[in-house]
Amino acid sequence: MAYRELKQKHRALREVFHTNLSLRTHRALSWLDRAEQSAGDLDAQFIFLWIAFNAAYATDIDEQYRSTEKGMFESFFKKLVDLDSEDRLYHLVWAEFSSSIRVLLDNQYIFQPFWDSHNGKVPEDEWKQRFQLSKRKAANALGNRDTVQVLSVVFRRIYTLRNQIIHGGSTWSSQANRSQLNDCTALLFKVIPVLIDLMMDHPEQLWGDAFYPFLADD
């Protein structure tokens, strides 16, 4: 399911949606559309897809929690997986992207403590210990087919890649990060339409106030 089909569904249902859900999905779909139009520019596609994800899940939260955005992923994915009666997210994780996910989880360049060590914030042995611990936890989640935990860990890694690009820590179209960028973009292209669709399928759920709500006089 891609932008066009999802947008038709949104137009058909938005009148019965809460304003916050309608705004979230409208914004997310606009960025998904832009990502689909950016074929040939992997960096742009990744950025637009991340914005689409952010538009769908982010809520207006306390400043102290906003600085730990990564901590929000698990509760969001748990809600989606619980609502996913057709196991679409399960299928994506365990059928389509199982190999790619294992590669991503073994990639130190999208593990934030690696860069913290490189920048002198933590000792080298500390990031290595944390990396091994993270991989063991991920392996346990993979072994237990824990879709929520696997998606949460993967999106924390994607978040690090997002930071590298958004904060100017990467060169456009650089070969240095192509492997992880390819894998992350492919995963986002499949996961984001599913999560938008699940949200629209469940307007009765509380999805939270929209981040930066629309103001008529803006």
Region roles according to the model:
Residues 1-20, 49-141:
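Helix-loop junctions and short alpha-helical segments
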Residues 22-40, 138:
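Short amphipathic alpha-helical segments and their helix-coil junctions
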Residues 29, 43-50, 74, 98, ...:
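Non-catalytic, well-ordered alpha-helical scaffold segments
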Residues 4-15, 19, 117-218:
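Polyanionic, low-complexity intrinsically disordered segments
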Residues 39, 64-67, 172-178:
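Short, surface-exposed loop/turn segments at secondary-structure junctions
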Residues 30-37, 47-58, 157:
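Short, hydrophobic/amphipathic alpha-helical patches that form generic packing surfaces
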Residues 39-42, 59, 87, 111, ...:
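Short secondary-structure junctions and interdomain/linker hinges
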